């Protein structure tokens, strides 16, 4: 590692990085040290304004694209060169933690600031991006901002999606963009030389192995569905079971069938029903309508394709009393990260004498869409007991700083190519 690069890495401040995490954690704070910072909400807008303020204090350039992805740019001496990009997301799950997503944004800002303080000149610009609606908790599906920015999906396909309160994404997006009207407009699918995203692991592998850094090799594939069941409302006390069209009973039958479909002795398949809406949702009424989500994941492309195709037939076979509708909402194939980026992360960890290992990501991340347009990869750091999407999510400040140092070194390597 060059001496100037070593100086930049050394300037990464564990205290400053932690302090910024704690400041962001106050925006949308909920009991139990958790965070509820939904995409395109007032809390999201507040977090964006804090990040913009920190960037402006350091004279970084700012921009935003049509879906609200926020860009912070440190120029390079070759203005025509494609940037090296880094970042993650600032939105959270409804009962999320203080580090998921926001760590990648703040580690990126820390890297840019450390490079600035060291006075390092880079050929390429380095850009931080805070992606819009990675979680998909308010407006499904997930990883929306990166999917639209890279051209994998069209913004128009998402604008009419509504949250549980009936608010359309187009209106929430317009409100968010109006809150920062002075930002420069960025085009979609702008060229990038590389993309490196830092993130907490959201699993227990690093902690259990006693490693500080994960060089992520790829992301498993997933299929999302909405399953709707149409029955008939009746009185719970007077309607014989044999005469009911009980939507909730069929929902239970379908979920049981899908659990059986996805059973895997190796515990590699991931199957989740995480959201359910019941109508009329009354104790003494038979349910007339149920809507629930299905999330299936696997790292092997053949297996995830087979499971995805089997969801609807299994659901229809399991429904005994009602009619159903199965709607695919997300289709992501497994992603393999660029070997050069994986090597650079591992090399930086070794040079900094940090214990590292290679591992795949079980969760989806924006890096999987960036991998479609440029060499991409990720850096994982441990989170306590692997807990994430939970108020109890926690990470050590030393591990967060270690990941930011590896990120700084890797960014500098690509920024001078």
Predicted regions and their residues:
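His/Asp/Glu-rich mid-to-C-terminal helical/loop segments that flank catalytic regions of hydrolases
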Residues: 219, 235, 239-265, 311, ...
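Catalytic-core environment of secreted peptidases
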Residues: 58, 70-103, 108
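Midchain, well-structured core segments that form catalytic/ion-binding scaffolds
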Residues: 134, 140-301
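A non-catalytic alpha/beta surface segment that caps or lines the substrate-entry region
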Residues: 29-75
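N-terminal capping segment at the start of a domain
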Residues: 2-41, 158, 328, 332
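Alpha-helical metal-binding/catalytic segments enriched in His/Glu/Asp
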Residues: 86, 95-135, 223-229, 238-261, ...
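Zn-dependent metallopeptidase/amidohydrolase metal-coordination segment
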Residues: 17-30, 87-88, 355-406, 411-414
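A short beta-alpha structural unit
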Residues: 39, 272-281, 293-300, 323-342, ...
